[in-house]
Amino acid sequence: MRRASRPASVRNALTDRSAINALVRDGLGAVKDKDKQFIDPSIRTQFVDSIDTDEAFRVGRDQEPRWDYLLGHENRSLIAVEPHSAKTDEIKAVINKKRALRQQLNGHLKDEMHISKWLWVASGPVCFPRGSKYEILLSQAGIKFVGRCVLAKHLV
């Protein structure tokens, strides 16, 4: 008999000892209202829980790069979302934010857990050409630029 698959949850991904457990919110509750517009309304209910990782890791790291959100999705995956200006001179900043979050999550994320999608959503006008060397840099870093809104197709 097969067990029903459980959705991925930020709560279940964090160790019991993690100091950031208390910051996890149901659904998109940890996502700032101004940033919810970057997630398509038709998929918002698919998120089990969320954490504002920018706030969670701010103390003592004011000058370090910080990725914005980690979301638990019903398709059994953890998804990192970064609303950020989409300019060519910001690509390295977004890549550095990913590297920083991976380090910041050390000791917080259970060993068997991993983030399956790293999504960059434009928080303003897109100022770099599609299919350019910049997208190659992002792809090599494991980050998908999704344009102005995270859609269902970005979650599969």
Model-derived features: positions:
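Acidic-basic catalytic patches of nuclease active cores, encompassing PD-(D/E)XK
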Residues: M1-R61
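Short, flexible active-site-proximal loops enriched in glycine and acidic residues
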Residues: N106-H114
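Short beta-strand-loop-alpha-helix junction that forms the active-site gateway
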Residues: P83-K92, P125
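Conserved strand-to-helix beginnings and helix N-cap segments that scaffold or border functional pockets
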Residues: I91-I95, G131-S132
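Conserved catalytic cores of phosphodiester-cleaving nucleases, focusing on short active-site segments
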Residues: Y69-L71, N75-K87
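Short, flexible loop/turn motifs enriched in small residues
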Residues: D62-R66
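Domain-level recognition of nuclease-like catalytic cores that cleave nucleotide substrates
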Residues: A4-N12, M113-V156
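Short, charged, amphipathic alpha-helix that recurs within catalytic cores of restriction-modification
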Residues: V94-G107
